[in-house]
Amino acid sequence: RDAQESRGLGDVYKRQEYAYGSILVECEGTLEYPHAELLGFTVAEEALTVNGVKMPLEELYKANTEKFAAVYPDKGRNSAEVMTSAPAPKTFVYPGEAVETPVVYIPVFPGTNCDYDTAKAFRAAGAEVRTSVLCNIAGDDVLRSIAEMKEHIRRAHIFVLAGGFSAGDEPDGSAKFIVNVLNNKDIRDEIHALTDRGGLILGICNGFQALVKSGLLPYGRLGMVTKESPTLFRNDVNRHISQIVSTRVATTASPWLRGFRPGELHSIAVSHGEGKFVVSEELARELFANGQVAFQYADAAGNPTAEAPWNPNGSSYAIEGIISQNGLILGKMGHTERYENNLFKNIAGNKQQSLFANAVAYFRKVQ
């Protein structure tokens, strides 16, 4: 941005009349308003020019971060290898009667904080959304909540685990509370019945952690977790990260991924402390061979990458999301639900990732 010569940013901030409640406006032309002051102009060049001094953004970022990088790193350890695959496309047809308004069920656990956004995204796509709160004040509350949850799953077409920090990510790790609920026999039986009848399951962020740690991903069934199973672990930078990432479509072998093209890129919000997908090389090769890797973190050129900041948590083989082998279950770290019109307007790329519309189309049997 070029600061105006006669009245730069520094001048405005030094003036006594500057106060809280002032509004910074970005507009196409000069505002015809008596109290509006022109501060500068946007330019294509990646630099700030203030009082005639040009400062490249890259140098400013380096100066802002490198002094404390040893204590507050913005990059973790880069893994050496990245895999890719080119799975054959698949067609998915819902085995039941066409449903114009599929029912989505979102359980709200202690610590869930993305249920409103997720519900709004599904409603915008044409689904009916039902929620229930899992109350854990007393033992009877838990039992009553689980019974209610069981009935909701039985009547749902889509089961969704939204993002958040269930039970504060305690004890010592994310999603353990949700996993215990999923492994309740009544809940487990209803979830298996849901997928057996062609229903869909989605887990985002904390929900993805629960799907992986319960065995629903990548195995498609609860109770199949072993010491060789993948997991989600603390980010390499050892702290919470919040940014926009570029993710690359790696497969279309799921109703959730209907209409996507392998290699297609999306700009997606991420916000998590434990988003590093950890998997052995042997199992990773199996996931890629099966076409179960849904999305990978991508660099500026659109290629899967192990390097920060594009792969912000250090995920193995750049994996951001995976699907079950039958394609009915999808889990991912990126918050697809957080985008809507007029958000992230200063972010480049395709921010509309049509997972929710794809799920509704599957039940409507749209060809």
Question: Positions of the model-derived regions?
Answer:
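Phosphate/diphosphate-binding loops
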Residues: 11-61, 185, 189-196
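Single conserved hydrophobic/aromatic residue that forms the stacking wall/gate
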Residues: 2-9, 13
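Generic beta-strand/beta-sheet core signal
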Residues: 6-7, 26-28, 39-42, 107-109, ...
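Short, glycine-/Ser/Thr-/acidic-enriched flexible segments
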Residues: 20-22, 28-32, 41-44, 55, ...
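A short alpha->loop->secondary-structure connector
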Residues: 218-228
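N-terminal beta1-alpha1 cap of cysteine-dependent amidohydrolase-like domains
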Residues: 50-204, 208-219, 233-241, 316, ...
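Amide-donor transfer/coupling interface in amidating biosynthetic enzymes
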Residues: 123, 143-151, 190-193, 227-367
